[in-house]
């Protein structure tokens, strides 16, 4: 029985709050920390049972790539599912190699003695079905054509991710989740778990998430979508077969996305009208580059090349 469901909005400022590190991670790895999960190896679960999507599309078989941290107890009920956001992946903690520049995206929160304590909990994070980090998705090979699925891959919904995660839980011998948690789109998955399978979830933690999008959310997403669709390298979603990548459209979409991640006040506090290049002098003909412009360009470029 679901015993708690917690919605958390905003970004806590307390140094002790684990939520502050939701999308953080060190850029340098001089030494793998002793209090982390260390080196981790992604695993792949193969499902040969046909999977029917909420929209009626059928996938004969599929794969889910995932990582685990900690050990599952004999009852199979000390497991925690971490659901990633739109730009996340299964790599939530630890390092894949000694020379990795940064750990998994929630490394500061997952590990021995950390808020998500791997000395007590068995932590699971999978790459969502339909994503491009190792689970079956548009860049996987369609067995019927021998080519990447591209735009022909079924369009998943949150319910589909939750159902595929339930299959993974059963595959791993998990009897129920001690908690399902995630932020943003990951938080929506946590909520969907509580709705669809309440007997499977003891605690639901949804961070910066809601049961549905507002009109403004939908509008910003539409602009971001059209930025990608308008890129000549999009090729109706079959860009891999065309030997192209819609990096310009993705970069612009990411810039739009970052406008929604901060409030107007937060953006003013962080950037103001500070210049990175140029000046306000009337006789200065050099291009002015505001710090906020540089920030958006950097985020767009970085995301589009991942």
Feature annotation, model-predicted:
Residues 148, 159-178:
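Conserved acidic catalytic loop of the alpha/beta-hydrolase fold
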Residues 28-82, 96:
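Catalytic-loop region of hydrolases
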Residues 67, 72-142:
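N-terminal cap/lid subdomain of alpha/beta-hydrolase-fold enzymes
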Residues 178-215:
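Conserved hydrolase catalytic core segment
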Residues 206-303:
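Alpha/beta-hydrolase-fold enzymes
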């Amino acid at each position: 029985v679901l015993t708690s469901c917690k919605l958390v909005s905003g970004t806590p400022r307390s140094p002790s709050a684990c939520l502050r590190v939701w999308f953080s991670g060190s850029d340098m790895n001089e030494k793998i920390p002793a209090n982390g999960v260390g080196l981790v190896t992604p695993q792949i679960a193969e499902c040969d049972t046909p999977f029917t999507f909420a929209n009626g599309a059928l996938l004969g078989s599929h794969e889910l790539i995932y990582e685990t941290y900690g050990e599952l107890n004999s009852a199979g009920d000390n497991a925690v599912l971490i659901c990633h956001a739109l730009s996340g992946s299964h790599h939530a903690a630890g390092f894949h190699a000694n020379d990795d520049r940064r750990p998994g995206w929630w490394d500061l929160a997952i590990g021995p003695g950390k808020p998500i304590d791997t000395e007590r909990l068995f932590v699971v994070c999978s790459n969502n079905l339909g994503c491009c980090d190792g689970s079956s998705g548009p860049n996987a090979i369609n067995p019927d054509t021998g080519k990447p699925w591209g735009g022909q891959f079924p369009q998943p919904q949150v319910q589909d991710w939750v159902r595929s995660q339930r299959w993974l839980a059963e595959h791993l011998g998990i009897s129920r989740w001690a908690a399902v948690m995630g932020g943003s789109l990951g938080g929506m998955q946590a909520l969907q778990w509580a709705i669809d399978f309440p007997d499977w979830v003891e605690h639901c933690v949804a961070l910066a998430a809601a049961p549905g999008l507002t009109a403004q959310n939908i509008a910003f997403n539409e602009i971001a979508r059209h930025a990608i669709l308008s890129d000549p390298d999009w090729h109706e979603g079959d860009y891999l077969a065309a030997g192209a990548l819609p990096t310009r459209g993705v970069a612009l979409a990411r810039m739009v996305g970052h406008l929604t991640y901060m409030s107007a006040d937060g953006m003013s506090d962080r950037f103001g009208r500070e210049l990175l290049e140029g000046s306000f002098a009337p006789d200065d003909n050099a291009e002015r580059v505001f710090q906020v412009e540089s920030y958006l360009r950097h985020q767009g470029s970085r995301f589009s090349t991942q």
